[in-house]
Amino acid sequence: MSYKELSTILKILSDSSRLEILDLLSCGELCACDLLEHFQFSQPTLSHHMKSLVDNELVTTRKDGNKHWYQLNHAILDDIIQNLNIINTSNQRCVCKNVKSGDC
C-alpha cells in the first residue's frame, strides 16, 4: 500500500460515523436498515458513508432482493494496521534508511 493510498483510507476513517459503522460491522454482516436504526441520520447520509467505505474497499456489499448487506473487509484492515506498524518501527522498508543523519 502506497503512502497516497494509506492517506486516502485514513481520511475516510477520520469520520466518526464511518468508524462507528465499521465497529458495528465488526460484529458481522448487517443490512443497511439495521445500520440506519443505530444512527440519527437519514438514509441518503448512510448511503453516502457506505459508498465511501465500499469504494475504498473497507467494506464489501451484496444485494439480496431489495436489501443491501455490508461486511467488513478484514484483509484491507489488516493491511492498514501492517502499514501503520511499519511507520511505527525502524525496518528495511523504512524511508529513513535513505536519509543520512547529520549530513545537512
UniProtKB/Swiss-Prot annotation:
Positions of the DNA-binding region: 32-51
Gene3D superfamilies (UniProt xref): Winged helix-like DNA-binding domain superfamily/Winged helix DNA-binding domain
Transmembrane segments: none
Coiled-coil residue spans: none
Molecular function per GO: DNA binding; DNA-binding transcription factor activity
Biological process per Gene Ontology, one example term: response to arsenic-containing substance
Residues annotated as domain HTH arsR-type: 1-92
Keyword terms: Arsenical resistance, DNA-binding, Plasmid, Repressor, Transcription, Transcription regulation
Keyword Transcription regulation tagged: yes
Protein role: Transcriptional repressor for the ars operon. ArsR is a trans-acting regulatory protein which controls its own expression. The repressive effect of ArsR is alleviated by oxyions of +III oxidation state of arsenic, antimony, and bismuth, as well as arsenate (As(V)).
NCBIfam families for the chain: HTH_metalloreg
Matching PANTHER family: ARSENICAL RESISTANCE OPERON REPRESSOR (PTHR33154:SF18), TRANSCRIPTIONAL REGULATOR, ARSR FAMILY (PTHR33154)
Listed name of the protein: Arsenical resistance operon repressor
Species lineage: Bacteria, Bacillati, Bacillota, Bacilli, Bacillales
Gene that this polypeptide is encoded by: arsR
